[in-house]
């Protein structure tokens, strides 16, 4: 669980997302409240429930990106799901309880990784011993083993090929579908999971370079040092106390006020979400999970439906509402220059692999931002995603000819942008279909 302050969380999000101060502050406070709750006495801790968040804003303004970056910061079990993937209980498809089962799966993997890091030093020593045994043989004297250990540490043996017995990761048992539960993996039953330990311990012989064998062996030795029961217990506790679920596209399961007739994937899904968000117990293959203290962050563009079209009970369970504003031309300039993962940096690096040096001038960046904002206004506002389209069109010719232009330097200025995009931007009909 992260112990970053709200200010630190916001400044971390600022590295990747421009603007949207309210949304960043809301998720930062929600994340910090998880830490605050952990500091409370046990009896009070159970009474403090998370305040779930509803993010409202047009497409392409950073809702999903906030969730993605939050997942990396949280150091807590986190899952992002689209509400449109689920159907009402009783119909073919995934029901919403699968969200918690997927969250538990993610938590097990995350917890195992953290615990592996804790025993890595001991696992490294055991892996080293196995490599030395493979090179020097079982009966080698201590002096010989020490000689090989020194060579191993100096890197002299990195290219030596050795034969090792490593765990066989292939699943010996097939998966089969449970009748009446078709579709996806949700109706699949893995016999390997059922019979678990009966098939554990299967090994296979592999020839590997010493340098390549280390990670495999360290992973194996770390797993031997871990207690599976403790991993499961710790992971389930982390899900119950610190889990975060990001529900994207929540507006797509709104039944519009003027719509008529039943819709399997809409109102029923909302009804099924109610107990999940309020607090219920979901059974998973690792054990039951209480969802009372899991934080839910829902988001949607609400382009056609309105937040008031959600079931009143669901609105009540998402008490904190945050509006994200549409992006302006100035925002696009900042997105292209200030973020750590700016498209300008990405294209410069991509062309650099072909030995073509690309540089962007301020007027070139301003031209890109202006075109993106203009097309968003005249055609359809898809936010920052429009920059992908514009950049791809500008670089189309260069991307194709880059291998033949090795060693050249290309400057992306207003003239370069106009040459590659001018005709399209002047014709609204063309930009409607191409940009």
Curated annotation (Swiss-Prot):
**Annotated positions binding ATP:** 18, 60-65, 248, 313, 385
Which cellular components does GO assign to this protein?
HslUV protease complex
Please give the InterPro entries that the UniProt record associates with this protein. Answer: AAA+_ATPase, ATP-dep_Clp_protease_ClpX, ATPase_AAA_core, Clp_ATPase_C, HslU, P-loop_NTPase
The answer, when asked if Nucleotide-binding is one of the entry's keywords, is: yes
GO biological process terms held by the UniProt record: protein unfolding; proteolysis involved in protein catabolic process
Q: Where in the cell is it found?
A: Cytoplasm
Q: Which GO terms describe its molecular function?
A: ATP binding; ATP hydrolysis activity; peptidase activity; proteasome-activating activity
The protein's UniProt keywords, in alphabetical order, are: ATP-binding, Chaperone, Cytoplasm, Nucleotide-binding
Q: What does this protein do?
A: ATPase subunit of a proteasome-like degradation complex; this subunit has chaperone activity. The binding of ATP and its subsequent hydrolysis by HslU are essential for unfolding of protein substrates subsequently hydrolyzed by HslV. HslU recognizes the N-terminal part of its protein substrates and unfolds these before they are guided to HslV for hydrolysis.
Q: Which PANTHER family match?
A: ATP-DEPENDENT CLP PROTEASE ATP-BINDING SUBUNIT CLPX-LIKE, MITOCHONDRIAL-RELATED, ATP-DEPENDENT PROTEASE ATPASE SUBUNIT HSLU
Q: Its family? A: Belongs to the ClpX chaperone family. HslU subfamily.
Assembly mode: A double ring-shaped homohexamer of HslV is capped on each side by a ring-shaped HslU homohexamer. The assembly of the HslU/HslV complex is dependent on binding of ATP.
The protein, known as: ATP-dependent protease ATPase subunit HslU
Species name: Ruegeria pomeroyi (strain ATCC 700808 / DSM 15171 / DSS-3)
Organism taxonomic ancestry = Bacteria, Pseudomonadati, Pseudomonadota, Alphaproteobacteria, Rhodobacterales
- Encoding gene, per UniProt annotation: hslU
């Amino acid at each position: 669980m992260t112990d970053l302050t709200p200010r630190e969380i916001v400044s971390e999000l600022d590295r990747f997302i421009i603007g949207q101060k309210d949304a960043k502050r809301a998720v930062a406070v929600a994340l910090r409240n998880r830490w605050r709750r952990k500091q409370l006495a046990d009896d009070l801790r159970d009474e403090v429930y998370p305040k779930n968040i509803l993010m409202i804003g047009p497409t392409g303004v950073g809702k999903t990106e906030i969730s993605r970056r939050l997942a990396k910061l949280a150091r807590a079990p986190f899952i992002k799901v689209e509400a449109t993937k689920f159907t009402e209980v009783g119909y073919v498809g995934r029901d919403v309880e699968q969200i918690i089962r997927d969250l538990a799966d993610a938590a097990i993997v995350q917890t195992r990784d953290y615990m592996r890091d804790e025993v890595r030093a001991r696992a490294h020593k055991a892996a080293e011993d196995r490599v030395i045994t493979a090179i020097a043989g079982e009966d080698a004297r201590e002096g010989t083993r020490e000689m090989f250990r020194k060579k191993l540490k100096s890197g002299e043996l990195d290219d030596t090929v050795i034969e090792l017995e490593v765990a066989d990761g292939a699943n010996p048992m097939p998966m089969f579908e449970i009748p009446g539960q078709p579709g996806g993996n949700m109706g699949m039953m893995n016999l390997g999971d059922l019979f678990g330990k009966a098939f554990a311990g299967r090994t296979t012989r592999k020839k590997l370079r010493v340098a390549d064998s280390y990670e495999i062996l360290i992973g194996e030795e770390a797993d031997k040092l871990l207690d599976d029961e403790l991993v499961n217990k710790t992971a389930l506790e982390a899900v119950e106390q610190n889990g975060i679920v990001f529900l994207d596209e929540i507006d797509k399961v709104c039944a519009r006020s003027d719509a008529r007739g039943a819709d399997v994937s809409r109102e029923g899904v909302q009804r099924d979400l109610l107990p999940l968000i309020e607090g219920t117990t979901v059974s998973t293959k690792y054990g039951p999970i209480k969802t009372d203290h899991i934080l839910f962050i829902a988001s949607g563009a609400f382009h056609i439906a309105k937040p008031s079209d959600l079931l009143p009970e669901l609105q009540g369970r998402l008490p904190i509402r945050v509006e994200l504003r549409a992006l302006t031309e100035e925002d696009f300039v900042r997105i292209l220059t200030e973020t750590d993962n700016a498209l300008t940096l990405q294209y410069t690096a991509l062309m650099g692999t072909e030995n073509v040096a690309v540089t962007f001038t301020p007027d070139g960046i301003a031209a890109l931002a202006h075109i993106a904002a203009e097309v968003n206004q005249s055609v359809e506002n898809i936010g920052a995603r429009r920059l992908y389209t514009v950049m791809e069109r500008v670089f189309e010719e260069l991307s194709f000819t880059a291998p033949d232009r090795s060693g050249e330097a290309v400057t992306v200025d207003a003239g370069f942008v106009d040459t590659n995009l001018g005709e399209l931007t002047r014709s609204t009909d063309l930009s409607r279909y191409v940009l």
